[in-house]
């Protein structure tokens, strides 16, 4: 698979552990691709849920995917500041169809005022039983929650204002070409 270039549009597909398609984002603009990471932006992007419902993202959001870490990060740029939605998920896989990952239910939300919340713990525990998450997988995901919280607490990567500003500025430049 040829890596997408800056300005290319890709589809993102989220799956569940049992292989079922969970959610699809159409036309995410790629801002940067490296050997291990993809940075993109969603802005009024069409999202299709597994039940067929469709909606459009409201604000620009910088998205970060990595091949090493078991999470992805969405930095939502809002009038009152940047909020984050972080999915505990498999490292991404890229093929000719889409960027793909498995969503493991647990989410960390960071509000513009810095408040953090771990979400969907009950859903995670339910799916862990239903879909037979292994003990090794459970350990990996819980360790990655710790890594993610460390990134948040230390303003690392996508949790840095400078990071969000640089990539949003680049998006505006590309959009207006």
Swiss-Prot record:
Name the enzyme's class.
Answer: hydrolase
Q: Which Pfam families does the entry link to?
A: DUF402
Q: What does this protein do?
A: Has nucleoside phosphatase activity towards nucleoside triphosphates and nucleoside diphosphates.
Give the reactions, separated by semicolons, that this protein catalyses.
a ribonucleoside 5'-triphosphate + H2O = a ribonucleoside 5'-diphosphate + phosphate + H(+); a ribonucleoside 5'-diphosphate + H2O = a ribonucleoside 5'-phosphate + phosphate + H(+)
Q: Which named protein is this?
A: Nucleoside triphosphate/diphosphate phosphatase
Q: Which residues bind Mg(2+) 1?
A: 87, 103, 107
From what organism does this protein derive?
Answer: Streptococcus sanguinis (strain SK36)
- To which protein family does this belong? Belongs to the Ntdp family.
């Amino acid at each position: 698979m040829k890596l997408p270039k800056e300005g290319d549009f890709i589809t993102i597909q989220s799956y569940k552990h049992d292989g079922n398609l969970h959610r699809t984002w159409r036309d995410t603009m790629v801002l940067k691709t490296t050997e291990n990471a993809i940075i993109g932006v969603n802005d009024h992007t069409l999202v299709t849920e597994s039940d067929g419902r469709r909606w459009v993202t409201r604000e620009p959001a910088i998205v970060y995917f990595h091949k090493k870490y078991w999470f992805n990060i969405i930095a939502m740029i809002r009038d009152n500041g940047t909020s984050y939605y972080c999915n505990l998920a498999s490292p991404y896989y890229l093929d000719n169809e889409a960027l793909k990952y498995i969503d493991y239910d647990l989410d960390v939300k960071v509000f513009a005022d810095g408040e953090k919340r771990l979400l969907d713990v009950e859903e995670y525990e339910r799916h862990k039983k239903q879909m037979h998450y292994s003990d090794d997988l459970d350990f990996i995901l819980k360790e990655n929650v710790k890594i993610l919280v460390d990134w948040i607490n230390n303003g690392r990567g996508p949790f840095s204002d400078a990071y969000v500003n640089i990539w949003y500025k680049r998006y505006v430049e590309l959009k207006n070409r």
